[in-house]
C-alpha cells in the first residue's frame, strides 16, 4: 500500500463519493444489501460469543470483524455513504446533484435495512424451529 498525502487522500474520497452517485440502482442495492446482512451476522456472532462465553469483552473484540469484512469486500454501509457522497456534491463535481445524493442515500438505506431484516428473519426462523 502506497502512502498518500492528505490532499490526494481527500481527492480519492471525493472520487469514491462521485462514483457512488453514478452507480446503477441494481449494483447499489446489492452492495448495500450485502453490507446490512454482513453487519447483522457480525452482531449475531458477537452476541452468540458473549452469551456462550459469558465474557462481553470477547464479543466486543470480535464485532469489528464485520466492519473489516465490509471494507475489504467494498460494500456500502449507510454511514460511509453519508460521508463520501456529500463530498462530491460540495466539490461541485459535474452531474452530482442533491437528487442523486438523496437517491443514493435512499437506495443504500433500503438495501442495508433489507439485508439486516433478512438476517433477523433467518435467525428468528433458526431459533424458533431449533435448527
Q: What residue ranges belong to the model's regions?
A:
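Alpha-helical transmembrane segments and their helix-helix packing motifs
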Residues: 1-131
